[in-house]
Amino acid sequence: VVLSEGRGNIYDCGFLPLTGTVSERYALIEPGRTSYHTLFEAIPAELRTQFYASIQRGSPCLMPVTGAAAARAQYTFEKPVRYQPMPIAQHLIGYLGASGHGVSGVEYAFDDLLTGGSTLTEVRCTMNARGGFIESDAPYLVESPGTGAGVMLTLDSSIQRACEAVGIEMVDKGCIVVLDAPTGRGRASVSLPLYDPENVAASIARQDTSLVNRALSAYNVGSVFKPLLAAAALEQGISAQETYECTGSIEVGGHVYRCAYGRGHGTVDMKTALEQSCNCYFVQLGLRLGAQTV
């Protein structure tokens, strides 16, 4: 009986694992009414049909159990859980589909490598003619190691956790990104709201777009592009003292772009336009420069 097909782990920059750090207990269920009556109520509701079908076939199966139910089971085994109860960097790491392959994030981008790094773990057991376990031959684990390959990120888990804590408290929808200035390496990447990679369906049902990675999504650059336009203009010999009359709106290609609140700034030069974030000044400046120059 397959316990775990495993998967290569994902690590932070200090080689601390971000996946596969926790486990849950699985009971090896022996076919027969004793197992059915003893453990059925302890089996998660979504797995009971599978549990019952296995019992009906007379086949042993593995089911997650906790607490007293685990104590009642004759044989239990630890199975690694891919994601922590409090997941970390879930938008960056991504999640797995029902097939066990990556659907998004690093899980998807490096799926071949992570799948090749997996270790197949099986529970071997010997059955008698009546479909029960042979007591003198206890079930045991057999592992078929993979390459052991994993993926190391530039992420720092301590910085990531700190950013997630701040984001949960302060941000409804948005993102937090921390970069190492000298190297450009990403140390944290948080997108909010968060989602549970072990229960993606619940996030889809919430309809809060929590599956969107806002840290990597495309946005209109807005006013942060204005200093770049100013620098390009100066490089092209356009004087910073040259003035422009802002009326509060400017039309380009049939679309009207407006300044904040639709009010004009009057006569502005480059310095004043930057200070007051004049949209019209920089739209006309961008048109003068052209895309290739910028």
Task: Label each residue range with its predicted role.
Residues 2-4, 170-171:
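Short solvent-exposed loop/turn micro-motifs enriched in small/polar/acidic residues
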Residues 21-24, 192, 262:
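Residue-level structural signal for beta-strand termini and adjacent loop
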Residues 27-37, 194-211:
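A short, polar/charged loop-to-alpha-helix boundary motif
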Residues 109-128, 170-190:
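Carboxylate/His-rich catalytic cores and anion/metal-binding grooves
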Residues 16-148:
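Small/polar-residue-rich segments within soluble enzyme cores
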Residues 142-182, 198-294:
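Active-site loop and adjoining helix of the penicillin-binding protein/serine DD-peptidase-beta-lactamase fold
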Residues 89-91, 185, 227-228:
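Short, solvent-exposed alpha-helical surface patches in non-cytosolic proteins
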Residues 3, 7-20, 163, 179-188:
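Short, glycine-anchored, charge-dense loop/turn motifs used at functional sites
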